[in-house]
Amino acid sequence: MRPLLKIAAIALLTLGIPLTATAQSTMLETFENTPETRWRFIADTVMGGLSRGQVSFLAEGSNAFARLTGTVSTANNGGFIQMRMDLPAPPPADATGLRLIVRGNDQRYFIHLRTAGTVLPWQYYQAGFDAPGEWTDIRLPFSAFKPSGRLLRNTPRTTGIKSVGIVAFGRDHQAQVDVREIGFY
């Protein structure tokens, strides 16, 4: 009887480890099942800018991903292209950051978080990341996100996060960034 209990205990521990790891992270998006209904493309043209681009949803083998491409132009007070998703629910209260799997054209890109407190269109919390040519796991703690202005809190309130945007921003350049997964940790 004791060997059977030992085997049962090992089985429970083995099963419990993945369950614990899963409970500590929340997957937000894997770009499967009609992601075009959840994501939208936005450019500085909404304010007179000249940037152009698009978001495409692609797959390589069994891996679905989104690709943000375009030309970012700072002419005419512009300077961004973005793919944005409104969250179906806020992140878990104990989440400490955002996780992405990305690749790109060796350029710097940004995540913009909007919260209940970002009322004006130009308000957001921003953190940057580099997108190398190979798929890379990026972790951005919420403490790394900086407000776009003085009227916002210093860091976003986790339970108030309403949307996530992947953004090519702030300088003239050709953008291409692929995103395979987004989640909270």
Give the location of each predicted region.
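Beta-rich carbohydrate-recognition modules and glycan-binding surfaces
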Residues: 2, 19-185
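Bacterial N-terminal signal peptides that target proteins for export
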Residues: 1-9
